[in-house]
Amino acid sequence: MCIRDRPKIADYPFTTLHPNLGVVHQDNKEFVIADIPGLIEGAHEGSGLGHRFLGHVERCKGLLHLIDVTSENIKRDYLTIIRELEAYDTSLSEKKQIIVLTKCDAVKDQKLNFAKEQLKKLNVKKVFGISSVSGENITKLVRQLQDLISSMNKIEDNQDGLEKVSSWSP
């Protein structure tokens, strides 16, 4: 995986202050990903530049939620985002989503499994655990994103009545 954009990364909350776009390259395919700053409670009312950030979310085909597994309350963190999306525009919560627990290298398996169970109780069907430090499950996640985008493109093409045309080269 290669993302050429190098947004600021640090070990404190809200490092991302502006949306960043990056192109992900994997398996001879590519897609654009938007890194949107974290939403806080009240974002739908404009708190923490919420309207501006949520406006960017509206233009995304799908959502990738990154939740810090070291958080004291994973359930609250997840529900805060979902509630803010719904309060801003109910169609946002209907977008396809992938839920990811980050910093999995920083916790024991017991904590990771507990976090996954908490999310499954909220009807989250699949939860990925990744580590940006070790690279654990990053490639697997990118391939899952590719599959999600591909399936969404097929649905859009079918709704538009478009036929899949194989590529042509002279």
Task: Kindly give the residue locations of the regions a language model identified.
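Short, small-residue-biased leader/transition segments that mark boundaries at the very start
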Residues: 1-3
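Flexible beta-alpha connector loops of hexameric P-loop NTPases
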Residues: 6-9, 37-46, 68-75, 105
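Switch I (G2) and immediately adjacent beta-strands of P-loop GTPase domains
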Residues: 12-43, 59-62
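C-terminal-of-GTPase-core extension/linker across diverse P-loop GTPases
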Residues: 15, 72, 76-79, 83-170
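Short secondary-structure boundary/capping elements
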Residues: 16, 45-49, 111
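A general structural signal for well-ordered alpha-helical packing
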Residues: 30-33, 50, 78
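Hydrophobic residues in beta-strands of the RecA-like P-loop NTPase core, especially within AAA+ ATPase
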Residues: 33-34, 67, 101
